[in-house]
Swiss-Prot record:
One Gene Ontology CC term in the entry: large ribosomal subunit
Name this polypeptide is given: Large ribosomal subunit protein uL1
HAMAP family: Ribosomal_uL1_B (MF_01318_B)
Record's keyword annotation contains Ribonucleoprotein: yes
Keyword tRNA-binding in annotation: yes
Keywords: Repressor, Ribonucleoprotein, Ribosomal protein, RNA-binding, rRNA-binding, Translation regulation, tRNA-binding
Cysteines joined through disulfide linkages: none
UniProt-listed Pfam families: Ribosomal_L1
Organism of this sequence: Tropheryma whipplei (strain Twist)
Matches recorded under SUPFAM superfamilies: Ribosomal protein L1
GO biological process, one term: regulation of translation
Residue runs in coiled coils: none
Annotated family: Belongs to the universal ribosomal protein uL1 family.
């Protein structure tokens, strides 16, 4: 069993494990108990009431956070010609065609978001073993397979996040850094939850969001009261 650090144990004592905290109180607690020396990510975990075994109940989507995530994002784009230049002009870290495909096939994955033009997806699709497990495979449903790669790059750099249920019906996403104000984190959360609610499967019945937790990177979690 992993031994928790003294700082972690100290942080946990300020959180009542059997209590559900209002959103702003929970945000404040996470900020107060973020003991890490780095500016930690502010993480949200949701437990949904869907049946993850049914493909028509999977929840997936993208959302633009009004205050961004606070994270420096590295974006690579599979594109050639004018599209490649548009991606570079928009701030992509790296752009390429078959040459970039070959590099990724050899193990290059030092990036956070991958975007592709439709024309190159025949090649990019062969990178499933490399990109798939890391959640980096471009997908038209999340706007990362598009002819307008310039806009996609700007969105990725400007606070765009993806969400997707795992096999246990959980969704994990980041709404900023612990250095963000309570107001900024609250607004980012509200926008994200609105989009997740819009993605509710039509055939789902019963309570949709069953539990919600906040935490910082390596910090203790706080259970949040649902409205």
């Amino acid at each position: 069993m992993t031994k928790r650090s003294k700082a972690y144990r100290s942080a946990v004592t300020s959180i009542a494990s059997d209590k559900l905290y209002p959103v702003e109180d929970a945000i404040g607690l996470v900020k107060e108990t973020a003991y890490a020396k780095i500016d930690s990510a502010f993480e949200v975990a949701l437990k949904l009431g869907i049946d993850p075994r049914k493909t028509d109940q999977l929840v997936r989507g993208v959302v633009m956070l009004p205050h961004g995530t606070g994270k420096a994002v590295r974006v690579v784009v599979f594109a050639t010609g004018p599209s490649a230049q548009a991606a570079l002009d928009s701030g992509a870290s790296e752009v390429g065609g078959s040459d970039l495909v070959a590099r990724v096939a050899d193990g290059y994955v030092d990036f956070d978001v991958a975007i592709s033009t439709p024309e190159l997806m025949a090649q990019v699709g062969q990178l499933g073993r490399v990109l798939g497990p890391r959640g980096l495979m471009p997908n038209p449903k999340t706007g990362t397979v598009t002819a307008d790669v310039g806009k996609a790059v700007k969105d990725a750099l400007g606070g765009r996040i993806e969400f997707k249920t795992d096999k246990h019906a959980n969704i994990h996403f980041v709404i900023g850094k612990t250095s963000f104000s309570v107001e900024s984190l609250s607004e980012n959360l509200s926008v994200a939850l609105d989009e997740i609610n819009r993605a509710r499967p039509q055939k789902h019945k019963g309570r949709y969001i069953k539990k919600m937790f906040f935490s910082s990177t390596f910090g203790p979690s706080v259970r949040v009261a649902l409205a």
